[in-house]
């Protein structure tokens, strides 16, 4: 690397790629909240077919890593819950 390479203008392809990666990361992060809300409602409806539960006792969380997304679901089912026929 020479002293002159510091002052050279960066090529447009790497700059465009970096901007695209930032844009994609932003879109993925913003769309996650809607997905979690939809999944929560669908999970609640499926569980409600079989067991009576309190909707406030169901927690759905999505964590995103660089390579994977993790969906965490916590459902508190009362010990004396009566099963329903599906």
UniProtKB/Swiss-Prot annotation:
Q: Which keywords does this chain's UniProt record carry?
A: Cell cycle, Cell division
Recorded hits in SUPFAM superfamilies, A to Z, give:
Cell division protein MinE topological specificity domain
* Keyword match Cell division: yes
Gene Ontology biological process: cell division; regulation of division septum assembly
Disulfide-bonded cysteines? none
Family under the similarity heading: Belongs to the MinE family.
**HAMAP family tied to this protein:** MinE
Query: What is the recorded function of this protein according to its Swiss-Prot or TrEMBL entry?
Result: Prevents the cell division inhibition by proteins MinC and MinD at internal division sites while permitting inhibition at polar sites. This ensures cell division at the proper site by restricting the formation of a division septum at the midpoint of the long axis of the cell.
- Indicate what this protein is called per its UniProt record: Cell division topological specificity factor
Q: Organism, per UniProt?
A: Agrobacterium fabrum (strain C58 / ATCC 33970) (Agrobacterium tumefaciens (strain C58))
Gene that produces this protein:
minE
